[in-house]
A protein has these predicted regions:
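Residues lining hydrophobic/aromatic ligand-binding pockets adjacent to catalytic sites
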Residues: 1-129
Length: 129
C-alpha cells in the first residue's frame, strides 16, 4: 500500500503526488482549476465554516481545533465513502492531501491525514481478525 502525504496546493505538482485531494472548503485563491490538478475535492469533509473561522490558523488553538475537527469527521455522513475512496487509491498510488494555508504543520490536512491513517489501520485490523 502507498502512503498518505500532505502538501501545499501552491507547491508544484509532482509525479509522486499520486491521487490529489483538496482538503479546503473554499477554493484556494489564485489557483486555476487546471493548475491545481485535483482528483477529488473533499469539501464535505473539510472543517465546518464555523470551525475554520474560529481556528483562523492560530497556533494556540490548534490542539482544540484538532479535537473539534476530529469530532466533525466522526459525525460526517460522508466519512465511510471517503475512507473507501482513499483506501482504493492507496492500493494503486500515493494520496496527497492538499491545503492552501501558509501554515504547513498546523492545518486541517495534518489532522485529516492522522485521522485517515487511524481509520485505515482500524479497517485493516477488522478485516484480518
Amino acid at each position: 500500500m502507498y502512503q498518505i502525504q500532505i502538501k501545499r496546493i501552491y507547491t508544484e505538482k509532482s509525479d509522486t503526488d499520486g491521487f490529489r485531494i483538496l482538503t479546503d472548503r473554499l477554493w484556494p485563491r489564485g489557483i486555476a482549476k487546471e493548475k491545481a490538478a485535483i482528483d477529488f475535492w473533499a469539501k464535505e469533509l473539510s472543517p465546518s465554516t464555523y470551525l475554520r473561522k474560529w481556528f483562523d490558523h492560530k497556533e494556540e488553538l490548534f490542539t482544540r481545533f484538532r479535537e473539534l475537527y476530529r469530532e466533525e469527521l466522526e459525525k460526517n455522513p460522508e466519512k465511510d465513502s471517503f475512507i473507501r475512496l482513499v483506501k482504493e487509491e492507496l492500493e494503486k498510488e500515493a494520496v496527497t492531501l492538499l491545503f492552501a494555508s501558509k501554515e504547513e504543520k498546523l492545518n486541517q490536512a495534518t489532522v485529516l491525514s492522522e485521522w485517515l491513517k487511524e481509520q485505515l489501520s482500524e479497517n485493516t485490523k477488522e478485516h484480518s481478525a
